[in-house]
Amino acid sequence: KRFLQITVKDTDRQRECRMQEDKIRQEEQERKRKDISISINELKEIFLNLFSGKDQNGKEINAQRRGYLFEEFLKKLFLNEGIEVTEPFKIVGEQIDGSIKYDGEHYIIEAKWHDKWSASDSLYQFAAKVEGKMYGRGVFISVNGFSPDSVQALTTGKALRTILVDSWDLVPITEGMYNLREMLDNKIKVAQTMGRIYVDSTNLAD
């Protein structure tokens, strides 16, 4: 009996600790969101400048600098809508890695700014990374989209744990046509109900 009482107390204490940790993390996320709060117009300007190969001051930038600014854009985009960034975005060249918590689920994020479609090898590597996690889910962002063959190869006969995002999904967000949460909800719903991981979100603006 005494053992059961101690176990219950320990469990309650652990639960309280987890709740306190969650509260601290949420407060930190809210503080970060307020610190980097940015308007839609500012996000649009940043994104358009990146397409022109320039920073906000109109200065020409190289691929590594563009990757860094794209990382900043994504971080602001997520935090601005109160989406918890659970793993800081890391950048290697034009590749960005991190993770978010959305609608109670953790998603691994990978983003690339290449001058052409993302090919099959990149998607396969990311899919393997997602599948290696318990209940893993992923969001792969490729500014210039994905080749039809690579999307088909990834979805044929496989468990769908990844959704794909490109600039055609991001630009309308910066135009205020719909927000990031609406875009993610739409893509997740279509993936879960129709088995399609790469869909056009512009119908949300209708």
Task: Specify the residue positions occupied by each region the protein language model found.
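Mixed-charge (Asp/Glu-Lys/Arg
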Residues: 1-206
